[in-house]
Amino acid sequence: MSDSTDALPIETHPFEPFLPAHARLLMLGTFPPAPKRWCMEWYYPNFTNDMWRIIGICFFGDKLHFVDTEHKTYRLDALKAFLREKGIAIFDTCLRIRRTTGTASDKDLEVVEQADLDGMLRALPLCQGVLAAGQLATTLFTEHYGIDARKMKMGEHRDFVFEGREIGLYREPSSSRAYPMKVEEKAKFYDRMFAELGLYDDNDKSL
């Protein structure tokens, strides 16, 4: 840590962990973007990020299912209710950070304090899968649990054991528009993960 970064403000994660007790999937990013980029006060708040469009495609066959196009935001109440019903938990791998350049890019974040990963998994006794979104989130998670994720291809998962439970760590395409893949193609990867974890029911329009 340099003197120049020491002078930068420390940001604490702005959102509470979303941890439905029956969740079978935990989605972990790195840290939210700066508030000026938000279209709502919740996870994946950048309107150009495609995470909630991917969810819409996989479960409803409609990338705009959770999108409020008129107001350029997301239908947050419907989104939270859906994730709670399906058993999808969300938080990030970093609790406190410094932004070295003011962006949300992994390479521009200095980790001050990591999130309590063990505590999250203990709070989710039925969790069978973890999606670490982004390289820094994956690195922090794999280093913490001693997982060898080298040569791990897109769409694959690596199993690890936490307190007697076998859990799969999944690698999926980034939902950021900076990742060069159409949202429909990204959704195909996520679809397989959701199916493997048993998140679909007869009413869902899986791919």
Per-segment meaning from a language model:
Residues M1-P17, P33-P35, P45-F47, I54, ...:
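C-terminal capping/extension of enzyme domains
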Residues P20-H22, E85, G164:
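A generic fold-level signal
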Residues E85-H144:
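Internal catalytic-core helix/loop-beta-alpha segment
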